[in-house]
Amino acid sequence: MPRLQKNDNFIDKTFTVLADIILKILPTTKEEKQAFCYYRDGMSAQSEGEYAEALENYYEALRLEEDPYDRSYIIYNIGLIYASNGEHIKALEYYHQSLELNPRLPQAFNNIAIIYHYQGLKAADKQDNNMSKSMFDKAAEYWKQAIYLAPNNYIEAQNWLKTTGRLNNK
């Protein structure tokens, strides 16, 4: 069943209808329209926890989409799925790829920082102080980038940077 028919959330339905209208009036290619439909279906599946279906849709959208900016969001969402599945190394790869295409994507910087922070906590639990410090320092650098791009966001990260003395470290 197409994802469109499964969607019963009013806001999602409204977004879908508006997106379809915009796609009809904007001068876009058939591939761009198809890519957007796959991307939209991927987001819908992802929001329902249907990660395998979401990945299928995202990979198809990626195959069709040529615009680097739009590709960055598709790749970023693929990273989100891998992170949700605990595949942090793979998630990092996709977040970095999204930043190569769109270096002004604060959420990718934030999610990279979250993974490094998590790895720092795990290393601290194992009493591996060198690894813990290294991971926390990496997290700090990525959070600084996220905060630079979106200064009103990531308040918890800002507080962590302040309390750990990493806010002004270069």
Curated annotation (Swiss-Prot):
**Stated role:** Essential for the assembly of the photosystem I (PSI) complex. May act as a chaperone-like factor to guide the assembly of the PSI subunits.
**Start-end of each TPR repeat:** 35-68, 72-105, 120-153
Keywords from the UniProt entry:
Chloroplast, Membrane, Photosynthesis, Plastid, Repeat, Thylakoid, TPR repeat
Similarity section: Belongs to the Ycf3 family.
Q: Name one GO cellular component term.
A: chloroplast thylakoid membrane
Alphabetized InterPro entries for the sequence: PSI_Ycf3_assembly, TPR-like_helical_dom_sf, TPR_rpt, Ycf3/AcsC/BcsC/TPR_MFPF
Q: Does the keyword Kinase apply?
A: no
Tell me one Pfam family matched here.
TPR_1
Q: Which Gene3D superfamilies match?
A: Tetratricopeptide repeat domain
A Gene Ontology biological process annotation?
photosynthesis
The answer on whether this UniProt entry bears the keyword Iron-sulfur reads: no
Where does it reside? Plastid, Chloroplast thylakoid membrane
**Main subcellular localisation:** plastid
Q: Its membrane topology, per UniProt? A: Peripheral membrane protein
Protein's name in the database: Photosystem I assembly protein Ycf3
Query: What gene does this protein come from?
Result: ycf3
What organism does the UniProt record list as the source?
Gracilaria tenuistipitata var. liui
